[in-house]
Amino acid sequence: MALLPFFDLTNFESDASEELGWLKYVGRVQTRVFPQHFKDNLEKVRKISETIDVIVDTTAELGPEACVNLLNAGALAILVNEEMLNELADISPNRLVLKTDTTDIGKIEKLSQVAGSIQWIGSAENYPPDFFERASKIIHKAVMPEGGGRTLYLEFPEQPSMEVLKSFSVHSVVPVLSSSFLTVKPAEEPKKLSLADLILISANTDREDGLFSTLVVNELGIALGLVYSSKESVAESLKTGTGVYQSRKRGLWYKGASSGAVQHLIHIDVDCDEDCLRFVVYQTGKGFCHLDTLHCFGQASGLCQLEKTLIDRKNNAPEGSYTARLFSDPKLLRAKIMEEAEELCDATTKENVIWEMADLMYFAITRCVGSGVSLNDISRHLDLKHRKVTRRKGDAKVAWQEKLKDKGGVANTSYTA
């Protein structure tokens, strides 16, 4: 992660995609919640989390219950002070970021075992010259309990220079910067920091032409192809909100400009070794490849291909086709989903489970496509459910309890997912 933009919740109303604007291309923001507006702020965090990851500063006198509610609402992590860190000791370190101004290296080493990451506050000049180099070695020497690297953040209350930020990037310090400091149009706003320059601030390449290897994936994480990027192409991609790359022969390559297979940019990030960019995009048209396939490794398959086919059938299915009938007859579709779900439950062999699950997914995804719901929407929702730190008992509804009793089964057991 090259930077963490700070986004003021008072600027947010209802549409995360629109109101976050180009900030969503970073894939993650930080914000702050206050007790006097907690209910409203909680809903805003929930809404923004449907689109991008949010780290929430809870140090404005929020209690443990409010902190847990924010995590349940989908916050990727929360910033806490040392006192709250101790009260939330049962929460995974992956979800906790300690906010501090301590320079005690021994204390930092101890606290970093409880908080996955640490964010320092105040002016960088207030810290000893070699402090962040030493702190970085401690923070980064171990991975998180649930996987992933620990992060060292530094909050900048005033806009720093690129030279200052580069000096911190050497030690893998991630700057927390107000969104008002940033721009995707540096030529028009020369006093602000270029978002493209910040994303690439620690990226490296061993190519003589200085281009960065770039993996392009769709919203489901499926690799579409390998391309190259330059500072200019990244800047243009952020400015236009589309996939723009660097052709080694033709210069800037605006994907889809001639074919119509335009890519809508979701976000850009850099891999753990900082030598490969990843563009996450929504691919339109027939696909990414010049051979009119979704990706450069052949045809799409599995759920991705099923969704693509169903979307096409919804828009172009000939009258009388079975899929067209399903889209136009909600009672039939409902019956088929219930029928296949029951057959899946009754399946007794591995082969039967595979068969019935495939049937159920066909009808279930047809239902989703008919309602304008994508696999990516579902995937994101599953991620948010996984982030909950408190769980409901999960009993079946009464009607299904009775149905199971009729089959001689046991209706309810307590579990935690």
From Swiss-Prot:
Ranges for region Phosphoribosyl-AMP cyclohydrolase: 225-299
Region (Phosphoribosyl-ATP pyrophosphohydrolase): 303-387
Top-level division of the source organism's lineage: Eukaryota
One GO term of the biological process aspect: L-histidine biosynthetic process
GO MF, any single term: phosphoribosyl-AMP cyclohydrolase activity
EC number: 3.5.4.19, 3.6.1.31
GO cellular component, one term: nucleus
Pathways involved: Amino-acid biosynthesis; L-histidine biosynthesis; L-histidine from 5-phospho-alpha-D-ribose 1-diphosphate: step 2/9; Amino-acid biosynthesis; L-histidine biosynthesis; L-histidine from 5-phospho-alpha-D-ribose 1-diphosphate: step 3/9
NCBIfam families xref list: histidine_hisI
PANTHER family according to UniProt: HISTIDINE BIOSYNTHESIS BIFUNCTIONAL PROTEIN, HISTIDINE BIOSYNTHESIS BIFUNCTIONAL PROTEIN HIS7
Full protein name: Histidine biosynthesis bifunctional protein his7
Source organism of the structure: Schizosaccharomyces pombe (strain 972 / ATCC 24843) (Fission yeast)
Gene behind this protein: his7
